Every structure is written in structure tokens, then in C-alpha cells.
């Protein structure tokens, strides 16, 4: 059984880049057909660990869809007023998460 550190709708932060984001889906292991260099560079995490689909905001506040290993993420500790668009996205996903699982 795979145990995930983060849940769908949870706000997180990229450990290296510092970008905030929201988990929108979870794969129990790496599931993309062919990894791109950006997805695997600097990442020693085995492909058998959890991987997360995350919508992040770059340093200009623009949304970016990313696919990241659990080891690249940390829990978001900032105030909910720092990233209002991510707060709204997290709330919508959390409300719909029970529907998405069935």
C-alpha cells in the first residue's frame, strides 16, 4: 500500500523553487510514458514513490501544471491571503474530491 504525504486539494510548496501550488491529482508511482529532462533532473526519487499533478504559480503569478515527486514538495505554511487564486482552487478541489473518487 502506498502512503501519500499530501492530499488532493492540499496547498504545497516546491522545495527547490519555492513556488506555491495545489495538488490536483496523485499517482501512486510515476506514470507518464516518457519523462522529460525537467521532470527527472535533480530528482533522485525512485519512480515507484508517489507523484503529484500540481497547479503552481510561478514568480509572476501565472498558473503552471507540473508533475512532481513527493520528495520535491513540502507543506505550504503561508497565510491564506498570500495566494488567493490558489486558495480558491484548493477549496473547489476539496469540495469536489469526494465526487472525483467515485
Curated annotation (Swiss-Prot):
<dbReference type="GO" id="GO:0003677">
    <property type="term" value="F:DNA binding"/>
</dbReference>
<keyword id="KW-0346">Stress response</keyword>
<dbReference type="GO" id="GO:0009408">
    <property type="term" value="P:response to heat"/>
</dbReference>
<comment type="function">
    <text>Involved in the degradation of certain denaturated proteins, including DnaA, during heat shock stress.</text>
</comment>
<dbReference type="GO" id="GO:0005737">
    <property type="term" value="C:cytoplasm"/>
</dbReference>
<keyword id="KW-0963">Cytoplasm</keyword>
<dbReference type="Pfam" id="PF08755">
    <property type="entry name" value="YccV-like"/>
</dbReference>
<dbReference type="InterPro" id="IPR022866">
    <property type="entry name" value="HspQ"/>
</dbReference>
<comment type="similarity">
    <text>Belongs to the HspQ family.</text>
</comment>
<protein>
    <recommendedName>
        <fullName>Heat shock protein HspQ</fullName>
    </recommendedName>
</protein>
<dbReference type="InterPro" id="IPR036623">
    <property type="entry name" value="Hemimethylated_DNA-bd_sf"/>
</dbReference>
<dbReference type="InterPro" id="IPR011722">
    <property type="entry name" value="Hemimethylated_DNA-bd_dom"/>
</dbReference>
Amino acid at each position: 500500500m502506498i502512503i501519500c504525504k499530501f492530499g488532493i486539494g492540499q496547498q504545497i510548496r516546491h522545495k527547490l523553487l519555492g513556488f506555491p501550488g495545489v495538488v490536483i491529482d496523485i499517482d501512486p508511482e510515476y506514470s507518464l510514458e516518457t519523462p522529460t529532462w525537467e521532470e527527472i533532473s535533480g530528482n533522485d526519487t525512485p519512480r515507484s514513490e508517489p507523484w503529484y499533478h500540481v497547479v503552481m504559480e510561478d514568480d509572476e503569478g501565472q498558473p503552471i501544471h507540473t508533475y512532481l515527486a513527493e520528495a520535491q514538495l513540502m507543506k505550504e505554511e503561508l497565510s491564506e491571503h498570500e495566494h488567493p487564486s490558489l486558495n480558491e482552487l484548493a477549496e473547489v478541489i476539496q469540495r469536489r474530491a469526494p465526487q472525483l473518487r467515485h
